[in-house]
């Protein structure tokens, strides 16, 4: 079988890497891929944009790729699944209607309220004045969110009313483009965030291992939000008892409510949870795709062949499969970023030490990398590499990841030294 993976990040490298472990997979193509997928055996990069739906469909059909796995949220929100399915391709990823669960925070909040899913109290506004008067009445701390897709940068946890009002101005003045047509204002929840990614065929939904991400750029969870600076799985705070509640109160309710709206949702449903100090949980957000960097710690522990699960979702027979199997132990990944990220950064810096990192036993997933004219691997984004370790416990997994990342160098390299601080004691 030949599989086409859409995207160019660490998540997509991990998906291609995992798919290629199966003898059932003859070839993987990545659109557009990165420097890591370019060097995988039986994998090739295809120089097309992720929103060039016609080009992707023509390539897949002409080259005999029957299954398309979509990584990022933007093409899903633009309707890539609908387009490719009309051309006769099997697609793993929700339709444009289903992708609203990530593409519109206001739509997702309404769905949660309708479904009875535990979530933060919230209000939605279309003009700045009303939003600001609501904030005056509610007080700070408070959370301000741009409604649409903003690459993880559209959320402000405001500690003062002034900061919240500035965030509202930025959204309505167009900082996030069409993502800022609405603003969602939520109560500020405290506790630990957990990512629960689940696979669904539209009827059955099965969670993967819970993971914890580190979103802030700085050690001690300080500084600006990023796409994620590291992660580990399975997250101990997501106990079996809590996961059983998440299954019934979040995942199954979400799928049932999507069904009631006529939405046949097949792909990943990713619930971002806040676990409060008293052990309760609320859903902060839903995403319509694999998490990044969570995928890079979940897939190394997956024992069931990935393509079996993906095909079962696409063909709506997930309920017929045995429970998802996992190898024991723990997994951790540390993100190497370009200096200056999440602000401005340079591209084109030559990367050294990747073979040495892999020789330590770590797995290096490429994110913002490419091959230059001299066939050297160079930086090509803010988050550059994800160095993943696995072990019998978190101490071993984190030690392997950090031993690996210390072998890697490029001008301006930055990574957090405290990934896994909650579990590495």
Swiss-Prot record:
Alphabetically ordered keywords of this record: ATP-binding, Ligase, Magnesium, Manganese, Metal-binding, Nucleotide-binding, Purine biosynthesis
Reaction it catalyzes: 5-phospho-beta-D-ribosylamine + glycine + ATP = N(1)-(5-phospho-beta-D-ribosyl)glycinamide + ADP + phosphate + H(+)
InterPro entries noted in UniProt: ATP-grasp (IPR011761), ATP_grasp_subdomain_1 (IPR013815), PreATP-grasp_dom_sf (IPR016185), PRibGlycinamid_synth_ATP-grasp (IPR020561), PRibGlycinamide_synth (IPR000115), PRibGlycinamide_synth_C-dom (IPR020560), PRibGlycinamide_synth_C_sf (IPR037123), PRibGlycinamide_synth_CS (IPR020559)
UniProt-listed Pfam families: GARS_A, GARS_C, GARS_N
Cofactor remark: Binds 1 Mg(2+) or Mn(2+) ion per subunit.
Required cofactor names: Mg(2+); Mn(2+)
Any one GO biological process: 'de novo' IMP biosynthetic process
EC identifiers of the protein: 6.3.4.13
Annotated ranges, domain ATP-grasp: 109-315
GO molecular function: ATP binding; metal ion binding; phosphoribosylamine-glycine ligase activity
UniProt xrefs under PROSITE patterns: ATP_GRASP, GARS
Binding site for Mg(2+): 285, 287
Residues that bind ATP: 135-195
Involved pathway(s): Purine metabolism; IMP biosynthesis via de novo pathway; N(1)-(5-phospho-D-ribosyl)glycinamide from 5-phospho-alpha-D-ribose 1-diphosphate: step 2/2
The protein's enzyme class: ligase
UniProt-listed HAMAP family: GARS (MF_00138)
Family as reported in the entry's similarity comment: Belongs to the GARS family.
Protein name according to UniProt: Phosphoribosylamine--glycine ligase
Protein source organism: Nostoc sp. (strain PCC 7120 / SAG 25.82 / UTEX 2576)
Classification lineage: Bacteria, Bacillati, Cyanobacteriota, Cyanophyceae, Nostocales
């Amino acid at each position: 079988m030949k599989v086409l993976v859409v995207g160019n990040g660490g998540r997509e490298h991990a998906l291609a890497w995992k798919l290629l472990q199966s003898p059932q997979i003859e070839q993987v193509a990545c659109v557009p891929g990165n420097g890591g997928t370019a060097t995988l055996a039986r994998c090739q990069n295809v120089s097309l944009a992720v929103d060039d739906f016609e080009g992707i469909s023509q390539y897949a059909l002409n080259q005999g790729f029957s299954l398309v796995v979509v990584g990022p949220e933007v093409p899903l929100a633009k309707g890539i699944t609908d387009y490719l399915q009309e051309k006769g391709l099997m697609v793993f990823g929700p339709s444009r209607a289903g992708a609203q669960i990530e593409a519109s925070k206001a739509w997702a909040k309404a769905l949660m309220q309708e479904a009875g899913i535990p979530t933060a109290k919230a209000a939605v506004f279309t003009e700045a004045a009303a939003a600001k008067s609501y904030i005056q009445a509610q007080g700070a701390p408070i959370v301000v969110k741009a409604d649409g897709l903003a690459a993880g940068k559209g959320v402000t946890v405001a500690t003062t009313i002034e900061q919240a009002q500035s965030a509202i101005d930025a959204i309505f003045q167009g900082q996030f483009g069409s993502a800022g047509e609405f603003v969602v204002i939520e109560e500020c929840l405290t506790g630990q965030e957990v990512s629960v990614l689940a696979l669904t065929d539209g009827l059955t939904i099965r969670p993967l291992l819970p993971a914890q991400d580190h979103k802030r750029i700085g050690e001690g969870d300080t500084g600006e939000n990023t796409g994620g600076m590291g992660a580990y799985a399975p997250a101990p705070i997501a106990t079996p008892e809590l996961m059983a509640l998440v299954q019934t109160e979040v995942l199954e309710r979400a799928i049932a409510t999507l069904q009631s709206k006529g939405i046949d949702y097949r792909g990943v449903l990713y619930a971002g949870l806040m676990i409060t100090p008293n052990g309760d949980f609320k859903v902060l957000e839903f995403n319509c795709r694999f998490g990044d960097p969570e995928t890079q710690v979940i897939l190394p522990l997956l024992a069931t062949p990935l393509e079996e699960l993906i095909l079962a979702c696409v063909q709506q027979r997930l309920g017929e499969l045995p429970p998802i199997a996992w190898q024991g132990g723990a997994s951790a990944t540390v993100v190497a970023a370009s200096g200056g990220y999440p602000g401005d950064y340079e591209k084109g810096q030559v990367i050294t030490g990747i073979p040495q990192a892999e020789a330590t036993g770590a797995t290096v997933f490429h994110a913002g990398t490419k091959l230059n004219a001299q066939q050297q691997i160079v930086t090509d984004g803010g988050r550059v590499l994800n160095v993943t370790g696995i072990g019998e416990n978190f101490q071993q997994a984190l030690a392997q990841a950090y031993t690996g990342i210390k072998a890697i160098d490029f001008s301006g390299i930055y990574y957090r030294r405290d990934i896994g601080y909650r579990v590495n004691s």
